[in-house]
Amino acid sequence: MKSLKSSTHDVPHPEHVVWAPPAYDEQHHLFFSHGTVLIGIVGSLIITVAVVGNVLVCLAIFTEPILSHSKSNFFIVSLAVADLLLALLVMTFALVNDMYGYWLFGETFCFIWMSADVMCETASIFSICVISYDRLKQVQKPLHYEEFMTTTRALLIIACLWICSFVLSFVPIFLEWHELSVEEIKAIFKDNKTEKEKALEAHNFSSALNQTLGDNQKSNAKHVCLFDVHFTYSVIYSFICFYVPCTLMLTNYLRLFLIAQTHQVRIRSLQMTNPPQLRGQGASSYRNQGTQGSKAARTLTIITGTFLACWLPFFIINPIAAADEHLIPLECFMVTIWLGYFNSSVNPIIYGTSNSKFRAAFKRLLRCRSVKSVVGSISPVSPAYRAFSWIRPSRLDLSSSEHPSDACDTGRGKNSKGGDCATADPTKPDVSVSEEIIYAGTKVFDSDTAFSS
């Protein structure tokens, strides 16, 4: 969503009498004549990283059994798709528009482009908010999470997320709820004609004039894709699509941090009250939970903090620019827009550096290795092996042996290794099964599963 981009109108051409604001065109041309190369390089880099990174995220989740079995990763796919569409459908045309200084793709696509911009940004924001909520539910009630977050419920949440994003973008823009009328502009700026007023007058004038122009004349006219945002529309959109989700994200992060602190208190309590022989066992479990919870909180902080750093400047400036366009320089406004776009290229990098499962999947995809070769190379004692084993129901089946070769032969009273079957005390829990049960309860605190457990 941009305060300077949605209705298409003519920019003055030296050979024709199509009237439009020369002040805007001169300022626009002057700015980009000195920075076109830099804009092209930086914009192309942001787009490339966003496309490659988000494609890798989607491929990693769809091709890795460790990642594809997680309901949480459905929401990461939603975020990656939103960022990918933003890069392909919005950033690409925004870069061309900013480099040329005028719109090349027609009036109809101007509306589609602006609507896609608002929809993808909104879907990205909502997805990050849902991810933080999903993460909190795992930490709060890990044993009930699988029952709560079913595949149907996860897909329903994603569907609602995208439907809301579509309604908040395409409907208001195509119904022109966002636009200022000439009367509203005159009431705000009184007798001083502004660039927006001239633009709207030019649009009304040129719409009638273009009907009398020849095909060659109309083909030579240059157009600008403007988004003349009503102040009320800007405030409502910013509140619903940014400030409310951000408040929820920060609340979820705070609650997750408090849970991690609670486990730290339990660790100290166990160390002080339990006897030495039990202190190590209980404290070790809580210590792992507390440490992993702190890592998960830090990862969530990085995601949320990066998002705020990228989008907060734009959502502060946008209502101000809608109220009075002269308060915000064009250059400053464009920097905040591209800073928001930059968030779409940062998210895959954060996943790749903070999650070992994503790192392994990215390496496999970049090296074109098969899934079987990666799974076969995982050590039985590695965290990745434990995570992969955790998704297999047989690992928690107490009626079956994990190692068939060690099964007890009831006829001989011996196992396959010659050991005495009687040495296994049925009253004592099996160590491997106990580890799996503990892992099932504590895996949500693992930093590697901060957003993909």
UniProtKB/Swiss-Prot annotation:
Single GO biological process annotation from the record: adenylate cyclase-activating adrenergic receptor signaling pathway
Name this polypeptide is given: 5-hydroxytryptamine receptor 1
UniProt note on tissues of expression: Reproductive system.
Pfam family for this entry, one: 7tm_1
Disulfide bond positions: C110-C225
Topology in the lipid bilayer: Multi-pass membrane protein
Biased composition (Basic and acidic residues): 403-412
Species annotation: Aplysia californica (California sea hare)
Record carries keyword DNA repair: no
Stored PANTHER family: ADRENERGIC RECEPTOR-RELATED G-PROTEIN COUPLED RECEPTOR, OCTOPAMINE RECEPTOR BETA-3R
Compartment(s) of residence: Cell membrane
Gene name of the record: 5HTB1
InterPro entries, per database record: GPCR_Rhodpsn, GPCR_Rhodpsn_7TM
GO CC annotations on file: plasma membrane
GO molecular function: G protein-coupled receptor activity
Family: Belongs to the G-protein coupled receptor 1 family.
Positions in the Cytoplasmic compartment: 58-74, 134-153, 245-301, 353-453
Keyword set, alphabetical order: Cell membrane, Disulfide bond, G-protein coupled receptor, Membrane, Receptor, Transducer, Transmembrane, Transmembrane helix
SMART domains, sorted: 7TM_GPCR_Srsx (SM01381)
The organism's taxonomic lineage, starting at the top: Eukaryota, Metazoa, Spiralia, Lophotrochozoa, Mollusca
Extracellular side: 1-36, 95-110, 176-223, 323-331
